[in-house]
Regions:
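Amphipathic alpha-helical segments of tetratricopeptide repeats
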Residues: 3, 39-46, 79-86, 120-124, ...
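Hydrophobic positions within repeat-based interaction scaffolds
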Residues: 3-4, 32, 238, 254-320
């Protein structure tokens, strides 16, 4: 029993370390461990006294399920988060449950509802709550994916001001990447690369986190791909391809994972750009099977049921 308690304490410390460093995983705490450890540890934290730890741990677990490609389990967990928050009359819990719902919608490409969930989450958090900054990053990312760039920048500006005050904050790299992606989408690749180089400098000199390296490489490749498209620059296309292949090697163990699918989709665009249509088609067929389409419809039904529950509950008077 003592040995189990010691192990549980070590696992909880490892998970809390991920949360404090604002990273989804690390070399010692991979995705599968986050899921299994949280299943064991979260129930021990389910009380008003430890509600922040409890709901944040569950949020990290939802992210882990999404990254692993288990969207159905992520949706179930988001539903459980919301029900727990309601049972505990926890405004903080409802905020994080909404963020989890938003992440599940984002992964399902239901962007309007994802945005609505994120804004609901923001409504339940005070402006100076540390969770607010992470949420602003997610809202900016989503708005950029929706091509609502100027709206996205209204969320990036307070993040930039926050970063000026706390340049070594754990969200520094995600905030710099938000700036970079804005400039990639705006067609200013040189400015985007400058932000990515700043992020890389923090990674090289301070964080050394695999998740940070992955994000920096992914968006640097996107920048190179845009440069290749704008200037028909084959060298940049080759550099982008080399980065995508490097990243795919890291995630090829699970072809259902969000990262594998995102990078494969980027490779499709790149191959089309290079006129390598057969290779683009091969990847497309691997990614988009009939089974997957059916699964996607099932996810959408699940997620709509979850949001419907939330909207009905919203009409009930709740005292915090």
């Amino acid at each position: 029993y003592k040995r189990q308690t010691h192990t549980d304490n070590e696992h909880l410390s490892a998970l809390q370390s991920l949360i404090s460093r604002e990273i989804p995983y690390d070399a010692n705490t991979p995705i599968d461990s986050i899921i299994s450890w949280t299943n064991r540890l979260a129930p021990t934290l389910k009380s008003p006294r430890t509600e922040e730890s409890y709901f944040t741990l569950l949020l990290w677990q939802v992210s882990a399920y999404i990254m692993r490609g288990d969207l159905s389990l992520a949706i179930d967990r988001a539903r459980y988060m919301y029900e727990s928050a309601k049972d505990m009359n926890s405004s903080f819990g409802i905020a994080l449950a909404n963020q989890a719902i938003g992440q599940a919608y984002t992964a399902s490409y239901i962007q309007d509802k994802a945005l609505s969930s994120y804004l609901d989450a923001l409504h339940h958090l005070s402006p100076n709550n540390p969770q607010t900054y992470r949420l602003l990053v997610k809202i900016s990312t989503l708005l950029q994916q929706m091509n609502r760039l100027e709206e996205a920048m209204t969320y990036v500006k307070p993040l930039n001001q926050f970063l000026e005050q706390q340049p070594e904050h754990p969200l520094a790299i995600p905030i710099l990447i938000e700036n970079a992606t804005y400039y990639i989408s705006s067609g200013d690749q040189q400015t985007a690369l400058r932000y990515l180089q700043k992020a890389d400098s923090i990674y090289q000199n301070h964080t050394h986190e695999p998740a940070h390296e992955f994000s920096i490489d992914y968006y640097t490749a996107a920048c190179y791909r845009a440069l290749a498209a704008d200037g028909h620059d084959k060298q940049k296309a080759d550099e982008a391809l080399a980065l995508y292949n490097k990243l795919l090697k890291l995630v090829s163990g699970n072809k259902r994972s969000l990262e594998y699918r995102s990078i494969s989709a980027e490779k499709i665009y790149l191959y089309k750009l290079l006129g390598r249509f057969d290779e683009a088609c091969r990847i497309y067929q691997e990614l988009y099977t009939v089974t997957d389409t059916l699964a996607s419809k099932s996810y959408i039904r699940q997620i709509n049921a979850l949001k419907a529950t939330y909207q009905i509950d919203e009409l009930e008077p709740v005292s915090y």
